[in-house]
């Protein structure tokens, strides 16, 4: 999969639509990028049952986020992600030995390398930059026609400055941007049984 694969999301939504009068979309991190892109890229006719969406801690500019993840302070995150992805690649190779060449794994030192050798190639992109360019949701935000909220914390270590679409938010009344000072990446811890972000999600969606 990749973070711009909106056809997967469209398939799931169409599957559940007959069972509901109203549908609300919520996505976190790369899942949030998927939801924002789905709402704005115009590839599918969105059902009128989809009332509103919320996206949390989203790298709306995948290239910018990939650069942010290469910062020295993110070394542990980078290593952890690569370890998880490498394990998944070996498992997939066992399942499909003739379809998946994992020799390039030894060349992967950072997430951009993984996207260059695997994410992009497996999903039909020319390279990592082509993938980032086409899958990033930022370019589609001004086209979003349904009520949508994006919450990106200013201290999120995975986000570059370009992942705060202030200009785009000013151009689209359907798109709401919140940039709390704290929250990290999908953190937003608060007192009580619910996270601060969960309160914001419910407050926004209950308005529609």
Segments (PLM) and residue ranges:
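Catalytic histidine-centered segment of alpha/beta-hydrolase-like enzymes
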Residues: 183-196
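Short beta-strand/loop motif that positions the catalytic acidic residue
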Residues: 144, 150-152, 156
